[in-house]
Every structure is written in structure tokens, then in C-alpha cells.
Regions:
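Membrane-associated feature with strongest affinity for ZDHHC
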Residues: 1-104, 109-118, 122-379
Length: 379
């Protein structure tokens, strides 16, 4: 069953989301028909249809976001002008250049057009092609669950009141199931509503989650100077929203060439990324592994400090052996982030080994900053 197109569905994220959608929809329809039967009046029918619309819209846009996908760059992609390659980062995994706004997703294994983030609930990235569907899914889920919460709470109040009810008394199991569903609905309204809020801010600014991080680093790079970094893709909130919201949620543009504001060009952001990469290389330090790292997320053998202070990220924890050399670019009190130094093999792409490992496993070797990190996706 989990082959071909269905492979994207067979994952804990989509299956959990589909289960929540199904439970909320079925229980709400059941309670709505008892509390306010649609045949009773025009407004009762409108209430029933309104919820049904949101439920159907949630399911449609959810499935569309999964199967439409974010849009991936072709393998070994190159810009039309060979001279433009100097402004782009090279992806060793895809063996091609990354177009403006594109980033490599280690979970999808490809470079994603206008990558925002990898969402476990759709088991896919949110990017250029499915950004509209994903946002519509969030909005529909929040709207539908808000209506569901009102209907279910009204049903419970009616059942628990001392007045006669116009439908058969529910069993204890049914009452518990409805209260559980209320919790699910409220949880969706709060959590998905917060995600929808951040997505709308991102769309209004025309700045993805990754680009927001790049802009923040660009600000700190220029701190104390008169130079300012201007995000090149924000051309006003209305224009920005039209780039994502269309009648059929289809993407605008080819995902490679983007409208930019006056004074910027297609490579304004990529040039900034390259400059940040150079700064990162200058800060890099070499560490030698003195204790093996198992790659475990719960490395209790390295002490309670390491165990209780993990990096709050889903980035890889890497396995390392004694005498391995790691180029470290990020530091925490109990953890280090770096890339394992490997020997290059001619005509054979190296699979990069980089991620977090416990700080007690390594000691710094030298203070030199002359290191060359394999060029790939932005951190």
C-alpha cells in the first residue's frame, strides 16, 4: 500500500492529521444533527453546511499540499548564464547550483524552490508550489475547528442541563468522546492558529522562515555600520499576498526567477548568503574526537549536563569515532555542531556527515581559520 503516490501519506504526520480531521468531522456532524438539526431551519442548515465546507476544504488542501509538493529543482541544475554561477551556492548532493530562494532539504533529499520549512504533518516541504494550499489548509482547519468547538460545547451544555433534551440521552462513552473531541478542536485552533499567524506574517513580508533567519544574520553582520540589508522580494503587502493566494492556489512564476524591488537583483540574497558562508568559515575551528559519539539523542553516558541540555532542533546527531576530525561552526555549552572532515574521492560525491555531538567528546586542536567547508545548503 505504501508505494508510489501513497508513500507520502504513510507517515505518522499525515496519518495523525487525517485521524484528527476524521474524528472532529464525524463527532461534530453527529452532535450538530442532534443539537441543531439542519432540517429545522435555514440557519441550522447554514450552520451544518458551513462546517461541512470547512471540513471538506481542510481535507482538500491538506491532500493537495502533500501531493502537489513544494516544487524541486532539477538535479544538476545550472543558471542560464554560466557567469551567474559565481553568485550561487553549489549543492553536492544534487550536484547542481541552488537557484535564488532554493535550499536543500535533507529529509526530501532535493533542493526545494522557495523553501519555507519541512512540515512533518504533510510529510513534505512547504515551498513555491504548495504554499497556497498549505496556508489554505491551516485557515480551513482553524475555521472548521472553531465552529466545531462551539457546536460541541453547546451539545455538552444541553446534555448536562437539567432540562429535557430533544434527542436520546448519550452514553457515558459518547460523552467522554465528545469532551475529548472538544480538546482536539481547541488544540487545533490554538496551535494551528499560531502557525497560521506566522505563515501570514511570512507571506505579507514575502520572506520565508529561512530567509528571515538569513536577514537576521545580515542585520548582525552590519551592526555598527551605516550599511543596511534590504530584503529584495518584498514589494508591498498586497503584491506579496498575490504571489501566494490565487483562486486555485496555483503558484505564480517558475520558482527560479523572482520579482525584486528597485536597487536589487536576482542574486542580492544569494550574495548575502555567500558572504555569511565566508564569515562562517572564518569562525570555524578544528576539533579532534577523544571519546566516541554514538549519534544518540539521549547520550546519558556523557553526563547529565549533555542529557538535560540538548539543542532544541531536529538536526542530525552524528556518530563519530576517536581520532575523527570535525570542523565546528556552532557552539553550545554541552553540544557542538560541525562537519566531519573527509578525504575527497575524484568523481565521487562525498556524503556530508554533519550535525550535533556532545562537547565532552572533543577537544579543540588549533585556532587557525583556514578551513574549506563543502559548499551546500544554508544552515
Amino acid at each position: 500500500m505504501c508505494i508510489g503516490p501513497l508513500k507520502k501519506i504513510c507517515h505518522w504526520g499525515p496519518l495523525t492529521a487525517l485521524g484528527i480531521i476524521k474524528i472532529i468531522t464525524l463527532i461534530t456532524i453527529h452532535c450538530s444533527r442532534q443539537w441543531w438539526p439542519p432540517q429545522e431551519s435555514f440557519w441550522a442548515t447554514a450552520n451544518f453546511c458551513f462546517f461541512f465546507f470547512f471540513s471538506g476544504s481542510t481535507l482538500f488542501h491538506f491532500i493537495s499540499a502533500i501531493f502537489e509538493g513544494p516544487g524541486f529543482l532539477p538535479l544538476k541544475w545550472k543558471p542560464e548564464k554560466a557567469t551567474d554561477a559565481q553568485f550561487l551556492q553549489y549543492c553536492t548532493v544534487c550536484q547542481g547550483y541552488k537557484a535564488p530562494r532554493s535550499h536543500h532539504c535533507r529529509k526530501c533529499g532535493l533542493c526545494v524552490m522557495k523553501m519555507d520549512h519541512h512540515c512533518p504533518w504533510i510529510n513534505n516541504c512547504v515551498g513555491h508550489h504548495n504554499h497556497g494550499h498549505f496556508t489554505a489548509f491551516l485557515a480551513s482547519a482553524v475555521g472548521g475547528c472553531f465552529i466545531s468547538t462551539v457546536i460541541l460545547i453547546a451539545w455538552v451544555v444541553t446534555v448536562l442541563s437539567l432540562k429535557p433534551i430533544p434527542f436520546p440521552p448519550p452514553s457515558v462513552f459518547t460523552l467522554i468522546l465528545v469532551i475529548f473531541t472538544i480538546g482536539l478542536s481547541i488544540g487545533v485552533v490554538l496551535t494551528v492558529g499560531m502557525l497560521l499567524y506566522f505563515q501570514m506574517i511570512s507571506i505579507i513580508k514575502n520572506k520565508t522562515e529561512i530567509e528571515d533567519w538569513i536577514s537576521e544574520k545580515a542585520y548582525h553582520r552590519r551592526f555598527g555600520t551605516d550599511e543596511k540589508f534590504i530584503h529584495p522580494y518584498s514589494k508591498g503587502w498586497l503584491f506579496n499576498m498575490r504571489q501566494v493566494f490565487t483562486w486555485d492556489c496555483s503558484p505564480v512564476g517558475d520558482g527560479i526567477n523572482w520579482p525584486v524591488i528597485d536597487g536589487c537583483d536576482q542574486y542580492t540574497l544569494t550574495k548575502e548568503q555567500l558572504a555569511q558562508k565566508m564569515d562562517k568559515r572564518r569562525r570555524a575551528r578544528r576539533y579532534r574526537i577523544i571519546k566516541p559519539s554514538s549519534g544518540s539523542w539521549l547520550p546519558i553516558q556523557h553526563g547529565w549536563g549533555v542529557l538535560c541540555h540538548p539543542p532544541y532542533t531536529d538536526e542530525t546527531r552524528i556518530k563519530l569515532d576517536v581520532t575523527d576530525i570535525v570542523i565546528v561552526t556552532r557552539w553550545r555549552r554541552y553540544w557542538l555542531f560541525g562537519e566531519k572532515e573527509q578525504k575527497a574521492i575524484i568523481d565521487f560525491p562525498i556524503k556530508r556527515v554533519r550535525g550535533w555531538f556532545p562537547r565532552p567528546c572533543a577537544i579543540e586542536l588549533i585556532e587557525s581559520n583556514q578551513y574549506t567547508l563543502t559548499s551546500s545548503k544554508s544552515d
